[in-house]
Amino acid sequence: MSELAMSNEEVFFKWSPDYSVDIKTIDNQHQELICILNHLFIAVSRRQADKEIAVILDDLVGYTKTHFALEERLMQQANYEGFEAHKLEHKKLIERLDQLGKKFMLEEKPIHFELLSFLKSWLKEHIQDSDKKYSSALQKKGFSIAAWESEATAAFIEMVEKTGRWWKKIW
């Protein structure tokens, strides 16, 4: 991903400790998603070349899919009751992101701030509602988050090596 310098005025979505789900690995991934969304916002704001925006959009979609896969793995391993509903939320967002990517690449439709606002709102609400629900349920069950995080790191690296994605370096 290209490095874009961000001034404080350009931060579209700022991480807050209120977004923490008390699972370090998941919090780190949420922060990275927010960072990628901020880069997309800056690229769109500065009217950067479509090619540069496409790279950031591809990173957002790819990282989101990887994050969702790990999050779903956690919920499955913990036998989380709300797993299917949570997975459906993920599926709907991925479908929307894939549609956006196709429109942008094939139909040359621009990315509008309305869409960026939608993504920001979706992520914020999803973290504060759905993700906090599963986190709380897992902790009440006594599920070993520490053991999962160790296994998740290895799984994440394996996924990255298969796809050759840039985000391997953040782990």
What name fits each language-model region?
Residues S2-W171:
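Small-residue-biased structural context
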